[in-house]
């Protein structure tokens, strides 16, 4: 029973799903003009979390055969046969229904629609495209950048420049983030036929130059929340400082072209986004 529970827990990709929920929560708090309705926020996060779990399970169903080929993913519940495809489909459907109902009641229609669009793009377009072309990273960056936008729209019910700003920052951040991961796991990905690095040169200065360019473009975006009155100037400078450090890591990758440098960049990307988003929120509140 315990091992079965652990398998289902693993199926949810809890850490990944939690980061998605976190960024949507940041968007939600930034959109609130008065006192945050914490109960509604928690319920919104549960709804979004559930839909994200559903998408992650669909992803694992589709990739169950290729997951067997990689050491990092071979121990997932589906490749190991601990959970059957039928059980995974039922679990995904239950999470999807639960998330849809919760968001329908405690969110807005536009936030619900965008959440479902995100699931479709991630599960049925990005996932199979990973073995076809590196353009999968571009496609996957859309659902990857929707969470803070969904959080904002869950409060306001409307699209606009402000949620677009949150989307733009997270959208551009994903390129160095995913390419750093793809660099580290390049040999594993090749076994499974996954193509995510932006050039055919693989781990090369050409690839590192592209990663540097995208990271450089991210630097000025940190000032947009301040310019649109979403947050203060302090957080803009924090975002700039984090962006510069992030860029220095890409320079190190260009110089070394090593897995070690890519690992540092990967961990740097993990830190960049939550630090910047927390800075925006705290600067708005205080």
Curated annotation (Swiss-Prot):
Q: What is this protein called?
A: Protoheme IX farnesyltransferase
Species of provenance: Cytophaga hutchinsonii (strain ATCC 33406 / DSM 1761 / CIP 103989 / NBRC 15051 / NCIMB 9469 / D465)
Q: Which InterPro entries match?
A: Protohaem_IX_farnesylTrfase (IPR006369), UbiA_prenyltransferase (IPR000537), UbiA_sf (IPR044878)
One Pfam family name is UbiA
What does the organism's lineage look like at the top? Bacteria, Pseudomonadati, Bacteroidota, Cytophagia, Cytophagales
Metabolic or biological pathway, per its Swiss-Prot or TrEMBL entry: Porphyrin-containing compound metabolism; heme O biosynthesis; heme O from protoheme: step 1/1
Role played:
Converts heme B (protoheme IX) to heme O by substitution of the vinyl group on carbon 2 of heme B porphyrin ring with a hydroxyethyl farnesyl side group.
Localization terms from the record: Cell inner membrane
Enzyme Commission number(s) from the entry: 2.5.1.141
Other noteworthy facts: Carbon 2 of the heme B porphyrin ring is defined according to the Fischer nomenclature.
- PANTHER family recorded for this chain? PROTOHEME IX FARNESYLTRANSFERASE, MITOCHONDRIAL (PTHR43448:SF2)
* A GO CC term assigned to this protein in UniProt: plasma membrane
- UniProt keyword Transmembrane present: yes
């Amino acid at each position: 029973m315990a091992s079965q529970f652990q398998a289902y827990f693993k199926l949810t990709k809890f850490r990944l799903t939690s980061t998605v929920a976190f960024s949507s929560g940041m968007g939600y708090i930034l959109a609130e003009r008065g006192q945050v309705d914490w109960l509604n926020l928690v319920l919104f996060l549960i709804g979004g979390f559930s839909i994200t779990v559903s998408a992650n399970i669909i992803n694992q169903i589709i990739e169950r055969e290729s997951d067997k080929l990689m050491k990092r993913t071979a121990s997932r519940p589906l490749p190991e046969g601990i959970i059957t495809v039928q059980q995974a489909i039922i679990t995904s459907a239950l999470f999807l229904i639960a998330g849809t109902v919760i968001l329908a009641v405690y969110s807005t229609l536009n936030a619900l629609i965008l959440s479902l669009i995100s699931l479709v793009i991630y599960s049925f377009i990005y996932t199979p495209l990973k073995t076809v072309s590196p353009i999968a990273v571009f496609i996957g960056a859309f659902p990857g950048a929707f969470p803070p936008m969904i959080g904002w729209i869950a409060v306001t019910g409307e699209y606009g420049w402000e949620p677009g700003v949150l989307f733009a920052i997270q959208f551009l951040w994903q390129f160095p983030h995913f390419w750093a991961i793809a660099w580290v796991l390049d040999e594993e990905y090749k076994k499974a036929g996954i193509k995510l690095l932006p050039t055919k040169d693989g781990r090369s200065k050409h690839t590192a130059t592209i990663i540097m360019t995208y990271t450089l473009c991210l630097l000025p975006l940190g000032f947009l929340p301040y310019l649109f009155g979403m947050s203060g100037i302090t957080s803009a400078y924090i975002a700039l400082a984090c962006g510069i450090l992030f860029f220095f890591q890409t320079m190190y990758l260009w110089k070394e072209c090593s897995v070690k440098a890519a690992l540092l960049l990967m961990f740097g990307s993990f830190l960049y986004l939550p630090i910047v988003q927390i800075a925006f929120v705290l600067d708005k509140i205080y």
